[in-house]
A protein has these predicted regions:
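Charged low-complexity stretches with an acidic bias
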Residues: 55-88
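Short amphipathic alpha-helical segments that predominantly mediate membrane engagement
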Residues: 1-60
């Protein structure tokens, strides 16, 4: 169940990525990297290295997006909560 929630949140994040202005290349790059890390988690659920890297990056990037992109920040917080429920 939580893995489906994670997939849904990832889909939402991909849609939100398209709302970031093209001139904000830094934010777009950060978000693309987060999406890739989440996809790695979904594809390799047993890989602890990906899990640790993902959580650290998510927590840090949530703050970055909080002011300019609050919807993205909330989605990232949702993903962190899902990962915690998954025991990651």
């Amino acid at each position: 169940m939580a893995e489906k929630e994670l997939k849904d949140a990832l889909d939402k994040l991909v849609v939100e990525l398209e709302t970031i202005d093209q001139s904000d290349a830094g934010s777009r790059t950060m978000l693309k990297q987060l999406v890739e890390l989440i996809e790695l988690k979904l594809n390799e659920p047993g890989n602890k290295e990906h899990h640790d890297q993902l959580l650290d990056k998510l927590k840090g990037e949530t703050v970055h997006f909080e002011v300019k992109h609050p919807l993205i920040s909330r989605t990232l917080e949702e993903i962190v909560a899902i990962l915690v429920r998954l025991g990651i």
